[in-house]
């Protein structure tokens, strides 16, 4: 082995640790929201995380939006501070960024809360759908309902 081959081998073996290689564990500190039971692949899926009862179901939320896919869809939230959160998901079929309701107030689009929780004649209270996020990787499930 000549001098150039030796240095090439050294660079390849030891230099590879300094290359920017995507980390396979990039999701370990992320919260994954698994939206289940999406009944069609049109419209958008909105996922909102609320930090308190005071901002629950108001516009002050940590949110993400993805194109709808029939079946299940995973949406990742990274860099969330530890704390209590409530999650709400809507399947916005017409793109107006709201949960459309009929004249009786019954949702016309898909919606869901943590673990499929339902309220009596309205959304469930914050206390029923909150969870504690400790900053470590986790996955939660939100099944959608269509009425």
What are these regions (language model features)?
Residues 40-55:
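Short, ordered, surface-exposed loop/turn motifs in non-cytosolic proteins
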Residues 1-28:
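Bacterial Sec-dependent N-terminal signal peptides
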Residues 85-89:
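A short tyrosine-centered beta-strand micro-motif
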Residues 109-146:
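Extracellular beta-sheet/turn segments enriched in Thr/Pro/Gly and aliphatic residues
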Residues 71, 76, 81-84:
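A glycine-anchored, Pro-Gly-centered beta-turn/N-cap motif
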Residues 29-37, 47, 142:
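A short, amphipathic beta-strand motif
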């Amino acid at each position: 082995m000549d001098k150039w081959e030796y240095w090439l081998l050294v660079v390849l073996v030891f230099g590879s640790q300094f290359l920017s290689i995507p980390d396979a564990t990039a999701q370990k500190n992320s919260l994954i929201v698994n939206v289940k039971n999406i009944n069609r692949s049109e419209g958008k899926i909105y996922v909102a995380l609320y930090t308190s009862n005071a901002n629950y179901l108001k516009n002050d939320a940590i949110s993400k939006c993805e194109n709808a896919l029939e079946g299940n869809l995973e949406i990742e939230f990274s860099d969330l501070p530890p704390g209590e959160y409530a999650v709400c998901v809507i399947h916005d079929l017409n793109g107006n960024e709201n949960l459309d309701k009929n004249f009786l107030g019954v949702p016309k689009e898909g919606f869901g809360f943590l673990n499929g929780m339902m309220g009596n004649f309205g959304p469930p209270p914050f206390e029923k759908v909150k969870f504690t996020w400790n900053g470590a990787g986790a996955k939660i499930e939100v099944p959608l309902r269509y009425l």
